[in-house]
Amino acid sequence: MSPDPRKPTKAQRQADARTRARAMREQRERAERRRRAGLVTAAALAAVAVVSVVVVAILAGGDDEVPQAVPASFSESGGFTVGDPGAPVAVSIYQDYQCPFCAQFEAANTDFLEERREAGDVAVTYYPLDLLRRLGDYSERSASAAVCVAEEAPEQFPAFNDALFANQPQEGAGGLTDQQVAALAAEAGVPDEVESCITSGRYTDWVTQVTDARDERVEGTPTVLVDDEVVPADQFQAAVDAALAGAPTS
């Protein structure tokens, strides 16, 4: 009997089997490639997410390290100079407006400094600090107010500096309100437009950072330097006069 031509031969069946096997193998390989691609994509997305979190954390941390406002008229170390910067004698005063010894130093030496400054003999650099922050926020608020005045009404800074010490509240008693400090500024001739800087505490963060990064020789207030040498407060005037006597004449 002759074979049925519609029935595939053994060779044809083997070829069909190989074709189906190859197709199944290629399908499995495509599925495996898709699976691996998915894993790579997921890993990449996870890495991006981690980087994003790190960047956000760094930026958030940076907000704590960079003060919101930085005064342009102060040095990098936090000092504001009154008088001729080229004067033969340089005086630096590190002070806290809540410090009673600073108020005593100011009362004893304000006239002396004014005379020497106006004569062109002395340049005075003031460093408003908040070393007594543990007693409340008045140190930083008053120091910030002093920075506001130095920035926006520098000619009135000496008078406002005197007024803050002359009206110094009892140490640790809470201090003057921002409105009372602004009123002292107005009495010292500071323009009204400076009030918002004072009452907003614009430079409090900056004051705290300057205090924390202060000269290592400043262990308390007042700390007074004459030509970069620390001198006892009760020997200050003698130290200035000695420096003037030894200064070269022009």
Segments the model singles out, each with a brief description of its role:
Residues 45, 55, 84-87, 91, ...:
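Hydrophobic/basic alpha-helical segments enriched in Actinobacteria
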Residues 71-89:
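A short beta-strand-turn-helix
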Residues 2-39, 43-51, 58, 183-250:
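C-terminal cap of thioredoxin/glutaredoxin-like
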Residues 52-73:
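C-terminal region of N-terminal signal peptides and the immediate post-cleavage residues
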Residues 87, 95-97, 103-178, 186:
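Structural alpha/beta surface segment adjacent to cysteine/selenocysteine redox centers
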Residues 91, 99, 224:
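Conserved S/T- and glycine-rich ATP-binding loop of Class I adenylate-forming
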Residues 81-83, 114, 215:
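Short secondary-structure boundary/capping segments
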